[in-house]
């Protein structure tokens, strides 16, 4: 009988235990090499539908498909062995009813091997969350600014700035938590609202543009690394890889055109007979 060894990954219980403790670290990952680099530093790797904009150049996340999420989820699972891997359910894959949500969530988990899925959880999605959790699928909620809803909201803008919006965001948080979400992403809200939600719900909250009042933080990795020429207000750049890549590409192009590359060190030579 053969032995199988398995690296211990972060679990739902590990994430739940972080409530009010050391903040959770989450970053996005869309490919195996990046996942391997981020894996030792993160509690959670999110295969976000942001990949539509970040990797595929789409104008929003609305055009992202199940096939895209599964392909990138598989790649991240090959690169990561310690962090929990969560895959976004794309727009149109869960809204119709709980059965649709279950079938698509099962497909994502079976075909990628991920540990959980994420749903942009307006209050209407509470039924879907409960349905999935009852059937063994861990769900991360997502409230506040919901990128999949930009066509209703009129673009990417912060939420909870009016009393009505504030009440709606709090209701979304309560609904997701009561339905069994093991964690909730709070995006694009003011600090006092993020603090109020974090204090009210029993599950951990992870903020993106929602202040340090949350139980953890997430950023799009490419934003954090400075790969784009525009930086959102809530992002802190920890590198300027756009400049690094631009400089490297320029030097490579110059060397090729001047026939400095490849040089002797990068060129194969015929072996002498007997050597």
Curated annotation (Swiss-Prot):
Binding site for Mg(2+): 49, 88, 120
Keywords: Cytoplasm, Magnesium, Metal-binding, Pantothenate biosynthesis, Transferase
Cofactor note: Binds 1 Mg(2+) ion per subunit.
Gene Ontology CC entries for this record: cytoplasm
Active-site residue numbers: 187
Cofactor(s) needed by this chain: Mg(2+)
Protein residues bound to 3-methyl-2-oxobutanoate: 49-50, 88, 118
Gene3D superfamilies assigned: Phosphoenolpyruvate-binding domains
Gene Ontology biological-process annotations: pantothenate biosynthetic process
InterPro entries: Pantoate_hydroxy_MeTrfase (IPR003700), Pyrv/PenolPyrv_kinase-like_dom (IPR015813), Pyrv_kinase-like_dom_sf (IPR040442)
Subunit structure: Homodecamer; pentamer of dimers.
Record protein name field: 3-methyl-2-oxobutanoate hydroxymethyltransferase
Organism (species): Hyphomonas neptunium (strain ATCC 15444)
Organism ancestry: Bacteria, Pseudomonadati, Pseudomonadota, Alphaproteobacteria, Hyphomonadales
């Amino acid at each position: 009988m053969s032995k199988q060894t398995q690296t211990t990954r972060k679990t739902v219980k590990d994430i739940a235990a972080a409530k009010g403790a050391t903040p959770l670290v989450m970053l996005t990952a869309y490919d195996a090499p990046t996942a391997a680099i981020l894996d030792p530093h993160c509690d959670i790797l999110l295969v976000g539908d942001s990949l539509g904009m970040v990797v595929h150049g789409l104008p929003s996340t609305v055009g992202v498909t199940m096939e895209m999420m599964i392909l990138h989820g598989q790649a991240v699972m090959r690169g990561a062995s310690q962090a929990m891997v969560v895959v976004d359910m794309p727009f149109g894959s869960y809204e119709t009813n709980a059965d649709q949500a279950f079938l698509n969530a099962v497909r994502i988990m079976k075909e990628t091997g991920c540990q959980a899925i994420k749903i942009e959880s307006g209050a209407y999605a509470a039924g879907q969350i409960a349905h999935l959790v009852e059937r063994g699928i861990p769900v991360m909620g997502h409230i506040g600014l919901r990128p999949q809803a930009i066509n209703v909201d009129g673009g990417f803008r912060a939420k909870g700035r009016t009393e009505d919006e504030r009440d709606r965001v709090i209701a979304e948080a309560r609904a997701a938590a009561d339905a069994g979400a093991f964690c909730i992403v709070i995006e694009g809200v003011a600090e006092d609202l993020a603090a109020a939600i974090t204090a009210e719900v029993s599950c951990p909250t992870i903020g993106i543009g929602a202040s340090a009042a949350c139980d953890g933080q997430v950023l799009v990795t490419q934003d954090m690394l400075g790969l784009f020429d525009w930086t959102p207000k809530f992002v802190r750049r920890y590198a300027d890889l756009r400049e690094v890549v631009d400089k490297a590409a320029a030097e490579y192009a110059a060397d090729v055109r001047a026939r400095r590359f490849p040089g002797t060190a990068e060129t194969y030579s015929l072996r002498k007979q007997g050597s």
